[in-house]
Design a protein with these regions (language model features):
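Long, structured stretches of catalytic cores involved in phosphate-ester chemistry, encompassing
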Residues: 1-195
Length: 195
């Protein structure tokens, strides 16, 4: 558990969604210290739960190679203020190995700081046009993250609900694209099953 994600998984910022090559408001830099921290937590096989980015992502860190380290669940903000988006496809960032769901802006990337990161899911905001504060919060990709740990199966079930929904209804559109997801503990040291 920490304040922020250890990768720069935001490419566009602010009300006008301007492109920013490297987001230094993350744990992506300095790279040597970032890699040292990940090397330490990899041994724990822990899911890295974090926030602070106003943008929900599910990603996996790479140090020596793509996907050799812990998964990161950057949960959505309950009331996203400063808008951020992860839109690498829009700016032509090279990628490889999209997940099986083949959603845009997912796959293996080098972030703006040169870190290896596999982005499995992202909850980008919509264009905010509504004056109602609850509708606006929904459009800005506010929401709720839920982690269910199964200690016998050694899995983490990750749910990522949008803001203005009823989570008790089994509607797949209640969650951001790419969720829910189940990750096995051993995947946090690069023994990957999810693709």
């Amino acid at each position: 558990l920490s304040q922020t994600v250890f990768s720069g998984v935001a490419t566009h910022h602010g009300r006008n969604q301007q492109y920013l090559k490297a987001d230094l408001d993350s744990g992506a830099w300095p790279q040597t210290q970032r890699n040292n921290a990940i090397d330490i937590i990899r041994k724990s096989m822990a899911l890295h739960i974090n926030g602070d980015q106003h943008l929900t992502t599910l990603s996996q860190y790479g140090v020596d190679k793509q996907r050799d380290s812990n998964w990161s669940f950057c949960t959505p903000a309950i009331a996203a203020g400063y808008p951020r988006s992860w839109l690498p496809d829009k700016v032509g960032m090279p990628h490889r190995n999209r997940p099986n769901h083949n959603q845009d802006n997912t796959g293996e990337y080098l972030d703006g700081c040169g870190n290896k990161v596999y982005v499995y899911a992202v909850g980008n905001p919509e264009t905010c046009v509504d004056k109602n504060r609850y509708t606006k919060a929904h459009q800005k990709a506010s929401g709720f993250g839920l982690v269910t740990i199964d200690i016998e199966a050694k899995t983490y079930k990750l749910d990522c609900f949008k803001f203005a929904i009823d989570a008790t209804l089994p509607n797949p559109d209640n969650q951001f694209p790419g969720w829910p997801v189940v990750i096995h503990q051993s995947e946090n040291r690069g023994e990957n099953r999810l693709s």
